[in-house]
Amino acid sequence: MFYIATFIIRFICELNKNNKNQVNCLVVDDTMIERCRGKKVELLSRQYNHVIGKTVKVFTNLALGWTDSINYVPLLSHLIASNKEKNLIQKSNTSNIDNRTTGAKRRLLACKKKPEVLISMCRKAMKAIPASYILMDSWFFSDFSCKKA
C-alpha cells in the first residue's frame, strides 16, 4: 500500500507543480477500534475512552496519511496494543512463530509505545514523499518525540 501511495502522491505533486500555494503535510491519527467481545483475541487491551468515560476493550489504529489540503492519501497504518502487561487481555503467543516473519514483526511493533511507532512511520514517509509539516494531536508532541525526531 505504501509504494502505491507514494506513486499517487508523486503524480499529484507533478500535476500541481505550478501551484505555489500548495502545502504538503503528513497527518497522524490514532483511533480506538472497540471490540466488545474477545477474551482470547491476541493483543486486545483495555484502555480508557475519554469520549464515553469508560474502560473498553480496544485496538488502537495509528494511521499516517498525506494531504495537500485538497487530496488525502493514506500511507501507513499500525494496530497498537497496550505496552503495559496489566492492560493486555490476551498476550501475544510468539513461542511457535518465526521472528523473521512479517507477523512476528507486527506483533513486536504492536507492543511499542505510540510515539516510538509514530517516529518510525514518519521517518519512512519522509524518505519517500515531500512534506513540509506534520499535523497531529497535541499529546503526540512530547519530550520523547522531540528528542528522537
Regions found by a protein language model. Name each.
Residues 1-135, 139-149:
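Conserved, well-structured functional cores that handle cations and Mg-NTP chemistry
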